[in-house]
Amino acid sequence: MMENLQVNQREKKTRHSSRQCRRKGLVPGVIYGKGINNFLFEIGELELNHALSVTGEHGLLSINSQEGSLNTLIKEVQRDPVTRRVLHIDLEKVEGNEEIETAVPINYVGEEYINKLDAVLQKNLDSIKVKCSPSNIPKGVNLNVGRAKPGDQFKIADVEFGNEITVVDDLNSIVASVSYDQKIITQEVVDQEVAENRAKKES
């Protein structure tokens, strides 16, 4: 799904101007790509947040401005590490239905079942790079880890994509692995040592 957004052109590209922009409830951004000069813009934070909730952070946006309309791909969303508010957004112009490379977020499904095993899921990747036409970009891809047990690993090859999508990343790359929770193991060892010491004192 492609969201339509109205943006306003901005002239300056300085830290001060970006801070001023954010104080007004606006988010600074840039559009770049083949055949165009970098286009600096600002957009309402609320409008952008709504669009990101629909498309995800690697989806498509139709941008309307004084210069006309452009179809774009979200390339990067910079967020404040504490508040998670959007600080800046980078967009790339896309041409028709020409294939493009983008990152697709991984949704880990069934992680709660791993936690019940006193185990943890170690996530090596949060997205996978793919190549496809703009209309076929998925908002995300699911990886079911619900039946995994400690020692299991998941590779990119274990993630299912449609035939219209080509995976760019190495299929043998480890996406995630399951291991015992070291905190629980450590606590069990401590409890055992305490029990053994108590038994020695009582004997």
Swiss-Prot record:
Keyword set for this entry? Ribonucleoprotein, Ribosomal protein, RNA-binding, rRNA-binding
The UniProt annotation puts the region (Disordered) at: 1-21
Q: A Gene Ontology MF term for this entry?
A: 5S rRNA binding
Among SUPFAM superfamilies, the record links this protein to: Ribosomal protein L25-like
Annotated Gene Ontology cellular component terms? cytosolic large ribosomal subunit
Ranges of Basic residues composition bias in the record = 12-21
What InterPro entries does the annotation carry?
Rbsml_bL25/Gln-tRNA_synth_N, Ribosomal_bL25/Gln-tRNA_synth, Ribosomal_bL25_b-dom, Ribosomal_bL25_C, Ribosomal_bL25_long, Ribosomal_L25_dom, Ribosomal_uL5_bac-type
**GO biological processes:** translation
Family in the record: Belongs to the bacterial ribosomal protein bL25 family. CTC subfamily.
Quaternary structure annotation from Swiss-Prot or TrEMBL:
Part of the 50S ribosomal subunit; part of the 5S rRNA/L5/L18/L25 subcomplex. Contacts the 5S rRNA. Binds to the 5S rRNA independently of L5 and L18.
Function in brief: This is one of the proteins that binds to the 5S RNA in the ribosome where it forms part of the central protuberance.
Please state what the protein is called: Large ribosomal subunit protein bL25
Please name the taxonomic classification of the source: Bacteria, Bacillati, Bacillota, Clostridia, Eubacteriales
